Regions:
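A short, basic/flexible loop-to-alpha-helix module at the beginning of a structural domain
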Residues: 1-17
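Glycine-rich adenosine-cofactor-binding loop
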Residues: 19-32
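NAD(P)-binding Rossmann-fold cofactor-contacting core
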Residues: 30-31, 37-60
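Rossmann-fold NAD(P) dinucleotide-binding segment
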Residues: 68-117
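Rossmann-fold dinucleotide-binding core
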Residues: 105-196
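Low-complexity, polybasic segments enriched for Lys interleaved with small residues
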Residues: 337-374
Length: 380
């Protein structure tokens, strides 16, 4: 079983009086730097001067400096910029300004596992990887809790690498939820596999294949969209909340029987062999090499794939369907002219007859509410 750490296993004092440089102010950089600051750590954000992120960080009350200046003298450098630009920023602005004994922290194992970055031997190399998008991390932190995270130690020059990783996790609030220990290789390869085989690649391919099958057989594209894409969120929410069995027990018996009895016909032995091959290619570094090459060449292959996806029938139909659910803001009503204050009524003298007020009609009696029929037992 995995080793899981909690609040009592981490100490923010480990980085008391230390300088933490966060490189980047995107989804992860923004959330992590602000949470670390609010947890009492001394944080400076390293950015390109004059960019939008620079202004955004300033507006959010962060100390900001050019990347090279932020790294100089820093005890911890958190590299929270996209995988594809880490190598260039490392060589040009981070590595030349490192001090001995500093800790280099990553939120993803890609750069170290696939040798995009090769740190010197006289620094700690750690990972603190929250399992959530940045905005959610920040929201949960402000609510007094935290999101789960992973930690790993690749290189322990000082002997304090794990303590520093746990301190960063506590600064984010992650130790309140639970922090799992892993390795850079395990995180990097499993993360890429999950994205490609299931979350981003597998699911979208399955959705499109289902949609195209129905449309090809003469079904209306709008109906196919609802059945193969729109309703997916309902199912995923049930799984995320309580696991597979929570989903099976909350769908109809027909859906449960059909799903369990036919799923191996779709994800069959051939599909599973393809997954094995995909994982082998990831572990061997084949995918990393291909991605780094495309990123360094201007992302031409990625852009071509994006264009093809954007022009697909399911995307065109999806825009139509989603527009049906848009809530348009009602036009602002014109302000009515201010009413004049009513004139004060003259006081009625004692003994004088009061002005007659028309009697109100009695409200009609409501018919007694009918009892709702008892619900049948069983699934919705």
């Amino acid at each position: 079983m995995a080793k899981i750490y909690h609040d009592s296993d981490a100490d923010l004092k480990v980085l008391k009086g230390k300088k933490v440089a966060v490189i980047g102010f995107g989804s992860q950089g923004k959330a992590q730097s602000m949470c670390m600051r609010d947890s009492g750590l001394d944080v400076v954000v390293g950015l390109r001067k004059g960019g939008k992120s620079w202004d955004d960080a300033k507006k959010n009350g962060m100390k900001v400096a050019p990347v090279a200046d932020a790294v100089k003298g820093a005890d911890v450098i958190m590299i929270l910029i996209p995988d594809e630009v880490q190598g260039k920023v490392w060589k040009g602005e981070i590595e030349p300004n490192l001090k001995e004994g500093a800790a280099i922290d990553f939120a993803h194992g890609f750069a170290i596992t696939f040798a995009v970055i090769k740190p010197p031997k006289n620094v700690d190399v750690i990972m603190m990887a929250p399992k959530s998008p940045g905005p959610m991390e920040r929201q949960v932190y402000l609510e007094g809790f935290g999101v789960p995270a992973l930690i790993a130690v690749q290189q322990d020059f000082t002997g304090n690498a794990k303590k520093i990783a746990l301190c960063l996790a506590k600064g984010l609030g992650a130790t309140k939820a639970g922090v799992i220990e892993t390795t850079f290789k395990e995180e990097a390869t499993s993360d890429l596999f999950g994205e490609q085989a299931v979350l981003c690649g597998g699911v979208t391919a399955l959705i499109e294949a289902g949609f195209n099958t129905l449309v090809k057989r003469g079904y209306q594209p709008e109906i196919a969209y609802f059945e193969c894409l729109h309703e997916l969120k309902l199912i995923v929410d049930l799984i995320q909340k309580g696991g597979m069995m929570n989903m099976w027990t909350n769908v109809s018996n027909t859906a449960e029987y059909g799903g369990l009895s036919t799923r191996d016909k779709v994800i069959n032995a051939q599909s599973k062999e393809a997954m094995e091959k995909l994982l082998d290619d990831i572990i061997a570094g084949k995918f990393a090499k291909e991605w780094v090459k495309d990123a360094n060449g201007g992302m031409k292959k990625l852009q071509a794939m994006e264009k093809k996806e954007a022009e697909s029938e399911i995307e065109v139909v999806g825009k139509e369907i989603r527009s049906l659910f848009e809530i348009k803001a009602a036009p602002k009503a014109k302000k009515a002219p201010a009413k004049k204050a009513p004139a004060k009524k003259a006081a009625v003298k004692k003994g004088a007859a009061k002005p007659s007020v028309p009697a109100k009609k009695a409200a009609p009696k409501k018919a007694p509410a009918k009892k709702a029929p008892a619900k049948k037992k069983g699934k919705a």
